[in-house]
Amino acid sequence: MQSNAISDNSSPWYLRPERGSEWGLRFMMLFYRLCGKFLTRVLLYPVVTFFFLTDRAGRRLSREFFERIYQHSGSSGSCSVLSHPPGVWDDFQRFYNFGCSMVDRIEVWGGTSWTTNVTWHGLQHFDCLQEQDGAVLMSAHIGNLDALRVASKTKTEKEIKALVFTKNSDHFMKVLNIVNPDALKDVVPIQNIDILTMLKLKNLIDEGNALGLVADRVTEGSPERVIEVPFLGDLAPFPQGPWILASLLGCPVYTIFCVRAERNRYDVFIEPFADKITLPGKQRETKLHDWICSYALNLEKYCCRFPHHWFNFYDFWSRSSKTSRRV
């Protein structure tokens, strides 16, 4: 893999190129196929160490994130595994867990038999989901949603379609297409949310699919459509788009997270969020703020519980008065 060192991690995530190259991802996939998961995870240590040592800004931002978790957990009484002041091992473990999630993605997308054990939390809500015509599953860049989509196939016939912003993941999408083109059939690639995209998504919901999307990052097409809400002790910008989208689709909304608890086990957490997202005319901005606040509070809970699986490696709290709005 090559080192595209990122000099300014305060830039929006969509302006930052992927670290690593297409051939590097190809090599990891080939190594996985030839040597298996165990040896691939062993290989991860020198690979992750290289990226960890060469990304000074990433290490700094990781430490700032853990400091937020540590301070917030102490002041709010939130449940957190971080009962000690954060150190280098916490930072490295977060980088390594991200590498492990990539290995799991290779296994999931490769079409091989996925043998990882899954523990479901709130499975009764998932059972209810099966009875509905369609739903939106709101998640975030914590854990591994690709693993979730495969695990869900053992529990329901309902298809989970992943809404994926492809521009920043161009290398990985190319490799996936080569390794297993069928793996992309459950992916809905987008650049921007426009009328044609909305019609396509509405059809998927009407056909009874569940639409999975992340609601923690601002999209490239609308960086100004942001609302700041409290998150881990400070105001953080969250996109309006997912909530406007959910209101237009007019279906039930759930929050869902899939986090690797051990080497061969994942925990899936699903909770009902709203029967329907409503944004009435004059109260539109206030309601948007309320929905995003509720989501951020829910996300905060999982960040405190699984801080080493938070995979936003940029300044999440960076904001500008010109591009974000306080309501």
Predicted regions and their residues:
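Short hydrophobic/aromatic residue motifs in ordered secondary structure
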Residues: 39, 144, 310-311
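Catalytic core of membrane glycerolipid acyltransferases/transacylases, capturing the structured
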Residues: 81-83, 87-100, 133-192, 207, ...
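Non-catalytic C-terminal accessory region of glycerolipid acyltransferases
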Residues: 154, 178, 182, 195-327
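Short, contiguous strand/loop micro-motifs
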Residues: 15, 49-50, 113, 136, ...
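A conditional alpha-helix N-cap/helix-loop micro-motif detector
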Residues: 116-120, 142, 169, 191-195, ...
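Membrane-anchoring hydrophobic helices of lipid-metabolizing enzymes
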Residues: 2-139, 175-179, 184
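General small-molecule cofactor/ligand-binding pocket signal
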Residues: 121, 188, 271
